[in-house]
Amino acid sequence: MLVAFFTLLLNGPEPVGSDHGVECPKVQLQLADGNLLDLDDVKENNLTEIAHINVSSSNKTLTYQHIGKSSRVEYNTLKTERGGEWNVVLEDGTKVYLNSSSTLKYPTSFTGDSRQVVLEGEAYFEVTHDPDKPFIVKTSDMNIVVRGTSFNVNAYSDYKTTRTTLVNGKIEVECSGNTHIVLPGQQIVFEKETKSIKIEDVDTELYASWKNGFYKFNDTRLEDILTTLSLWYDVDVIYADESVKELRFTSSGKIIR
């Protein structure tokens, strides 16, 4: 029955989520002073002014823009719950697609000799090129150092692995005291239990297509697929038969949420 449900969910006549009564949870922006803005409730206009930065919201995208000069740096935190997603254009023009159940902490403006953000969960980054100021994504297991490139980071705290997938450019990944070079079409995987690291060639669309609103699974375990869907649609999965977790599926289509 579970397999039939999954098949209907991905390949049925109606798109996923179209008539299932799924409502996107609140997406919140925490300002430096601790105040929280519920972005789902905010009209598309200027949200606030932070020092010399103007923050606006449109089409599920926050945009930070310079409106003056200041040495003041403040940190904002963008948080999505299960079923939610949001994008942010940082002060340097870097665009970040934040997936469900994820948190991104970042400065309202970048000063100093690097651009650093902190991620828990999953995000896709399109980093503005700056050879003099590397962009660094920090997770609990990896530091990803780039200067201008596109890549996906999957760093959920309750997952068994942390994965960074490079679409184009080049990245340096600092992990377990070592630095690893990752090239386009490669993925670096950190196994949390064994502390092991591997770099392998992958189909990047399997890991990055979500940011364009599509899913793609290729010979993927049912448990892994349903774990992903549970985040996208804020549902809990209960297995009456544990053996079905190992069944594998190949499917692709549009995400509607």
Model-derived regions, located:
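A residue-level detector for the "anchor" residue at the start of short, highly conserved motifs
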Residues: 5-257
